[in-house]
Amino acid sequence: MKVKNTIAATSFAAAGLAALAVAVSPPAAAGDLVGPGCAEYAAANPTGPASVQGMSQDPVAVAASNNPELTTLTAALSGQLNPQVNLVDTLNSGQYTVFAPTNAAFSKLPASTIDELKTNSSLLTSILTYHVVAGQTSPANVVGTRQTLQGASVTVTGQGNSLKVGNADVVCGGVSTANATVYMIDSVLMPPA
């Protein structure tokens, strides 16, 4: 009986140490990321809040606001594009995987769509929440179909530097923030009608 208790206590302690090691693992380094634009992004932002290391210190909406590639997304999330839509507190308070359209992705949208998003809060909210999935998903596990906060599903295909989210290519993904895993994508995803 004493041997079983000792083995159980040892196993419990080992499991606790393993969990602690995972909990304090460093954020992804530039070499752990996926996507053809990661090396360029890491080189352009080697230090500071916009760096891969810097983003890991902040909740996702704060990290996005520090990222020079995500200024349009930040404006859309924070009420700057449409004062009736502010998802900052929501995104900063849970664990998420965020498929983050870059500034270049937003620039592909027609000007009329951007104008509509400035006044149509339900459409903007639907589009933004279609880019967010509950729970953090690493590059090794991101492929598959997942339900978004918007309610519809999004499918991730490919592998390594050739991941796609719907029809959008992942530019750089697997970026850890304090509460999310971010995949920067080259197109804005539109939820199904």
From Swiss-Prot:
<protein>
    <recommendedName>
        <fullName>Immunogenic protein MPT70</fullName>
    </recommendedName>
</protein>
<dbReference type="InterPro" id="IPR000782">
    <property type="entry name" value="FAS1_domain"/>
</dbReference>
<dbReference type="InterPro" id="IPR050904">
    <property type="entry name" value="Adhesion/Biosynth-related"/>
</dbReference>
<comment type="subunit">
    <text>Generally found as a monomer; homodimer in culture fluids.</text>
</comment>
<dbReference type="GO" id="GO:0005615">
    <property type="term" value="C:extracellular space"/>
</dbReference>
<dbReference type="GO" id="GO:0031012">
    <property type="term" value="C:extracellular matrix"/>
</dbReference>
<dbReference type="InterPro" id="IPR036378">
    <property type="entry name" value="FAS1_dom_sf"/>
</dbReference>
<keyword id="KW-0732">Signal</keyword>
<dbReference type="GO" id="GO:0005576">
    <property type="term" value="C:extracellular region"/>
</dbReference>
<dbReference type="Pfam" id="PF02469">
    <property type="entry name" value="Fasciclin"/>
</dbReference>
<feature type="domain" description="FAS1">
    <location>
        <begin position="57"/>
        <end position="189"/>
    </location>
</feature>
<feature type="signal peptide">
    <location>
        <begin position="1"/>
        <end position="30"/>
    </location>
</feature>
<dbReference type="GO" id="GO:0050839">
    <property type="term" value="F:cell adhesion molecule binding"/>
</dbReference>
<keyword id="KW-0964">Secreted</keyword>
<dbReference type="GO" id="GO:0030198">
    <property type="term" value="P:extracellular matrix organization"/>
</dbReference>
<dbReference type="GO" id="GO:0007155">
    <property type="term" value="P:cell adhesion"/>
</dbReference>
